[in-house]
């Protein structure tokens, strides 16, 4: 058995490969790492993997905590994957490839697996990232605040109270009639409009039509305001990790 962990800014996701069969195990919050509860949450108590692979954008303290639990439970040291200049036939667009986030790189590899079509990848997590691939080459991307960061910024830098966002918003039209709805709907439309406009401009600039793939904890909230159809893949980064290991 192989075990894969994706350690993001707020969650830990896991998957396994056993006898060639891939299985996504779900996600837990960071608290489960510090307590070691993620082993039980993912039903890994009785497993004896031959290798454990990690993709992480988390602080070093969390990486160390995850590593310690893995070592204690599985009696082996995890392999931390990193961005490469090229892998699985895909070329990284960053000249300094080591500065390109490993989460974005793995998402690209997962999204482009088995496809030669131009691909537009949106990861709506704590930060919202966008990347594009044409003819197996990553042509670049953007990073902007995610929905949560936008909403937190309004709370921290204005007179809005956190309580005002806890209240259930009731809307009978497009525009909000209370503070919660104003913040929730406004930030949603900001990101949705940004993605819609960016994709239009990108297709005009390149003369290509893109297949669109979305992932991340907030993507399903964004999907209703997006103009083009997106394929949602919850475990996209883990699937990219799988591609890396199978290419070795």
UniProtKB/Swiss-Prot annotation:
A monovalent cation. Ammonium or potassium. Gene3D superfamilies: 3.30.420.40. Its cofactor is NH4(+); K(+). The active site is at 103 (proton acceptor). It is an enzyme of class 2 (transferase). SUPFAM superfamilies: Actin-like ATPase domain. It holds the Pfam family Pan_kinase. K(+) binds at residue 123. Substrate binds at residues 94, 101-104, 179. Its EC number is 2.7.1.33. CDD domains: ASKHA_NBD_PanK-III. Catalyzes the phosphorylation of pantothenate (Pan), the first step in CoA biosynthesis. Belongs to the type III pantothenate kinase family. This is Type III pantothenate kinase. It comes from Hydrogenovibrio crunogenus (strain DSM 25203 / XCL-2). The gene is coaX.
